[in-house]
Amino acid sequence: KISIRKIAKRAGYNSATLYYYFEDLEHLILFASIRYLREYTSALARNIKKGMTTIEKYRTVYETFNHYAFRSPVIFHNMFFGKYSPMLLEVIKEYYDIFPDDLEGHDELLRGLLTQGNMYSRDKQIVDQLVSEGTIEDKKSDITLKIIISVHESYVYEAMIQGDKLDLDSHE
């Protein structure tokens, strides 16, 4: 089992040093997990094609998200839905300050999506565009957004619980 003490020992630090910077193990894991976004954003840049409609982009965003989230469900659940997920915006800003090239190849809509700290803010930008295009009714946009996020949160949670028993093909 992983612990702050074990991480500190392996890194050559006293555990008190890590506790100075991180509240607990989940907080530390949130910061360490951000590197998983690099693979996700690179895949997203490859998967989003010029000329795609907004709805096609949105589907592709979630297909790509699911691909990576189902393979590392504990990490993705912790990042987007866990105890410290409200801090994700701060962590993402720091990450993209260090690795701005990870936003290359994305249009303005997707750059906005990738730099948001929570799923609601992230997806709202795309749903608002879908409303302006007439794909979703304005009065139904908020509930649509909440349902989409809740469904994906439950999928990632299920993947986390099932572990290796999860049939990835049927969930993607």
What are these regions (language model features)?
Residues K1-H27, F31:
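Helix-turn-helix
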Residues S3, H77-M79, L88, K139, ...:
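Short, hydrophobic secondary-structure boundary micro-motifs
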Residues K6, T60, T64, N78, ...:
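Amphipathic alpha-helical interaction segments
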Residues L109, Y120, Q129-E172:
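Hydrophobic/aromatic-rich alpha-helical bundle segments in the mid-to-C-terminal region
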Residues P86-S132:
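Amphipathic alpha-helical packing segments from all-alpha helical-bundle domains
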Residues R10, H27-H67, R71, N78:
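Alpha-helical structural segments
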Residues R59-I98, Y120:
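Helical hydrophobic small-molecule/effector-binding pocket
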